[in-house]
Amino acid sequence: MTLLKSYFGEFGGMYVPQILMPALYKLEIEFLKALNDLQFTNELSNLLKNYAGRPTPLTLCKNITKNTNTKLYLKREDLLHGGAHKTNQVLGQALLAKKMSKKEIIAETGAGQHGVATALSCALLGLKCRIYMGFKDVIRQQQNVFRMQLMGAKVISVKNGSGTLKDACNEALRDWSENYCTSHYMIGTAAGPHPYPTMVKKFQSIIGIETRCQILKQESCLPNIIIACIGGGSNAIGIFSEFIKDKSVCLIGVEPAGKGIKTGKHGAPMQHGSTGIYFGMKAPVMQTSEGQIKESWSISAGLDFPAVGPEHAWLKHIGRATYVSITDCEAINAFKILCKLEGIIPALESSHALAYALKLISKDTNKKQIIIVNISGRGDKDIDTIRKIDVYKE
């Protein structure tokens, strides 16, 4: 029996081999103890402030919205140490692993941002780490692979399946099944078996807490709309968390439509998947009628995932959040616009959220509204990808 709720409505659960159940129960207990341990919370707060660089700014875009009545703010997780929001929850999990006397960290990564965050936290806290990464992602994210290796991580290229994030997740879970006594599995998103979705949300909620304080200080009111990209869903649930109770705030998650929904090459399980069992949870999944997992597709490695976290599924089910999709081309266009008009280079993942914001703004330029987009990471890692794409030619 779990101490916290392990389901969000019908979504969630602990669909793992029986051998891992004691490890998950133990993790839940230690997580709850840590939250009530002043030494732990103070140490985490200190690391977030003095090591990671929190709070991150809430930046008003002054050029993109010229000649409109929209105020567009960006929550700047790209400025966090490590280059993305991943650092928030990785520091929390790494401290928890130390508290549990674990010696090694196992992780998976797609875009490499979670891998980089894992590597830097392990270097800081003296933990060994091995990081699984699909071979396709190793090729397209070579800069992040080298960053991980510089910080002492062992990066394991996964050649099984499609060689992307889902395959890295499978291998990491398999590794943990064999080494759970000495290792902690540091899941990188708000998905997986309980208690991971709840734990990751808690450590990422700092994004929403800061955003709420910042927008109230700058505008003396809440935003009309908050938009975040959705892969597994950690950056989105982090910023959504403090606004779920505010029904006046529209919450929008943006999935990757890839090369177009009709092509089948996308990563949009919320809109075009069905409920299934994957990665230790019950959630929307891209699957065949026989329950076989389909290959997802996105130009952004961090969104190239065939499922989504259970709380997002529940938020959609109850009508509290809306989920849409943006194609590769639309994301690339938004990437270029932010670079050229505001001097900010966003991650391709975040560019999906920005692209949808630009769509909303262009629909009615006279509408008075405040929109916040979570810029979940910086785009240094994506420069080579953008440079090679024909659509970037002027």
Swiss-Prot record:
It catalyses: (1S,2R)-1-C-(indol-3-yl)glycerol 3-phosphate + L-serine = D-glyceraldehyde 3-phosphate + L-tryptophan + H2O. Coiled coil: none annotated. Transmembrane segments: none annotated. Keywords: Amino-acid biosynthesis, Aromatic amino acid biosynthesis, Lyase, Pyridoxal phosphate, Tryptophan biosynthesis. It comes from the Bacteria. GO terms for cellular component: cytoplasm. Its cofactor is pyridoxal 5'-phosphate. Its EC number is 4.2.1.20. InterPro entries: Trp_synth_b_CS (IPR006653), Trp_synth_beta (IPR006654), Trp_synth_beta/beta-like (IPR023026), TrpB-like_PALP (IPR001926), TrpB-like_PALP_sf (IPR036052). GO terms for molecular function: tryptophan synthase activity. Tetramer of two alpha and two beta chains. Belongs to the TrpB family. This is Tryptophan synthase beta chain.
